[in-house]
């Protein structure tokens, strides 16, 4: 079985945890897409009923509608479960997310979930956060160069995400600064410092949130728990 097929299998394992009548956080990205499609299939087949999705991006909202999942906006009520991908997964299941640009809506949604289930492939496993991927930080466009200068006082390097002539724009109308993490750092203290920087909306650090991860590896799907 190739890696893409195993990613689909990981998504199926995550969706097997969803029960009828639940409110489900719908993640964003190529792996979360498989989970949304499987939820739609189960609803259409009558294997699940009464599911309501809460989307973490315009892309996941569009896909949910296409596969027949009823959706509603995020409100103060808790979600029963959320399923999403990750860009890095540390041994304690702390995460870096946001390379797809939806980090703020993902965090706002998933912090309200009773259970956060991650699906990914084995290349996302790291010994420490920042080992393979930058840390996305969403910043407001107004004065963004000043915000970046403030961030570089304690996070040297990094760059504004700019795939073309103009900066990348999130669903919220903001920009993303991709920071390089140091070799050693206190994740919670760093998150506090970044979020305390004027102009920052939020970071791609998802700390203490994930309950488990289904990881597609060459020898099959591994289940990791906190």
From Swiss-Prot:
Q: Which regions span the lipid bilayer?
A: none
Q: What keyword terms does UniProt attach to this protein?
A: Isomerase
- Pathways involved: Carbohydrate degradation; pentose phosphate pathway; D-ribose 5-phosphate from D-ribulose 5-phosphate (non-oxidative stage): step 1/1
Q: Does the keyword Isomerase apply?
A: yes
The entry marks the following residues as binding substrate, namely 28-31, 84-87, 97-100, 124
Q: Which reaction does it catalyse?
A: aldehydo-D-ribose 5-phosphate = D-ribulose 5-phosphate
Catalytic residues (positions):
106 (proton acceptor)
The reply on keyword Translocase is: no
Say which enzyme class the record assigns. Answer: isomerase
Query: Which GO MF terms does the UniProt record name?
Result: ribose-5-phosphate isomerase activity
Specify the domain of life of the species encoding this protein. Bacteria
Q: Which GO terms describe its biological process?
A: pentose-phosphate shunt, non-oxidative branch
Enzyme Commission number(s): 5.3.1.6
What functional role does this protein have? Answer: Catalyzes the reversible conversion of ribose-5-phosphate to ribulose 5-phosphate.
Q: How would you summarize the oligomeric state and partners of this protein?
A: Homodimer.
Please state which protein family the record places this protein in. Belongs to the ribose 5-phosphate isomerase family.
HAMAP family found in the cross-reference section: Rib_5P_isom_A (MF_00170)
- Protein's name in the database: Ribose-5-phosphate isomerase A
Organism of this sequence: Deinococcus radiodurans (strain ATCC 13939 / DSM 20539 / JCM 16871 / CCUG 27074 / LMG 4051 / NBRC 15346 / NCIMB 9279 / VKM B-1422 / R1)
The gene for this chain is: rpiA
């Amino acid at each position: 079985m190739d890696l893409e097929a195993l990613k689909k299998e990981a998504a199926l394992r995550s969706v097997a945890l969803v029960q009828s009548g639940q409110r489900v956080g719908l993640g964003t990205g190529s792996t979360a897409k498989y989970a949304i499609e499987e939820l739609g299939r189960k609803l259409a087949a009558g294997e699940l009923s009464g599911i309501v999705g809460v989307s973490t991006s315009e892309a996941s909202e569009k896909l949910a509608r296409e596969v027949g999942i009823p959706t509603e906006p995020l409100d103060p009520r808790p979600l029963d479960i959320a399923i999403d991908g990750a860009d890095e997964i540390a041994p304690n299941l702390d995460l870096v997310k946001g390379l797809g640009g939806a980090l703020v809506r993902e965090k706002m949604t998933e912090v309200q979930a009773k259970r956060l289930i991650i699906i990914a492939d084995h290349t996302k496993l790291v010994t420490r956060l920042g080992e393979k991927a930058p840390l996305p930080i969403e910043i407001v466009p107004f004065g963004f160069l000043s915000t970046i200068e403030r961030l570089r006082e304690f996070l040297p390097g990094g760059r504004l995400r700019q795939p073309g002539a103009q900066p990348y724009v999130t669903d919220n109308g903001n920009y993303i600064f991709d920071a390089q993490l140091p070799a050693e750092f206190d994740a919670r203290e760093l998150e506090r410092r970044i979020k305390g920087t004027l102009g920052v909306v939020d970071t791609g650090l998802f700390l203490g949130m994930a309950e488990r991860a289904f990881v597609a590896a060459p020898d099959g799907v591994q289940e990791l728990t906190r």
